[in-house]
Amino acid sequence: MMNIDDIEKQKESNLAKGVLTGYGVIAMCEVTNPSPLFYGVGGAHISSQDGASIRLEGSGAIHLSSSITEQGQGTEAIMKQIAADQLGVSMDSVRVTLGDTDATPYGGGTWASRGAGIGGEAVLKAARTLKENILDIAAAIMQTDKNSLDVENNTVIRKNGGEGITLQQLAETVYYRGCLLYTSPSPRDNK
């Protein structure tokens, strides 16, 4: 914030030297995360959509891929925080791949401040979907109702206490010992 008293003193000092000085204040609101119509009017033919893909790897770690790129505005950290928060895991267990057009979902790109707003929403939705899938599989493994489970500190826990299962154990079962699950291809079919 500016210090008006200092500015007034500077004005007086300048006036004594025959220099007229003034100051002004401006307020503005910059548009961010607009629709494709907004971009199109300006001649920028880009999409206002972005994609995110999140998967539980065989090690129990999380891999997040997004079409957004990091340009120094902290988008990678923001996306990692969103994923970790939604999944109930530590940020250290989330690996992020941004902007690799061979490996990430299609999207409109960062374009300055839209990265966290639009790309972050895609990460939020993808993380919520993955968590539901994790809880479905955990419910099948633990032979309990999925609504009695949650994920905290990289572990699927029973809300009322009792033994849980780490995401590493869950991932090892899914990737390497699927025969231990129910006979149906989807735990949702076994309810």
Q: What function would you assign to each model-found segment?
A:
Residues 1-4, 107-141, 169-178:
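Glycine-rich and small/hydrophobic secondary-structure elements
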Residues 1-54:
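Accessory "access/gating" subregions that flank catalytic or transport cores
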Residues 9-14, 19-25, 65-67, 91-100, ...:
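Beta-strand segments within the central parallel beta-sheet cores of soluble alpha/beta enzyme folds
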Residues 28-33, 59-61, 68-71, 101, ...:
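Short, glycine-/Ser/Thr-/acidic-enriched flexible segments
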Residues 36-39, 75-77, 105-110, 161:
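Short acidic, glycine/serine/threonine-rich loops at helix termini
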Residues 61-91, 117-142:
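Alpha-helical support elements that line or immediately flank enzyme active sites
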Residues 156-158, 165-174:
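Polar, glycine-rich mid-to-C-terminal structural blocks
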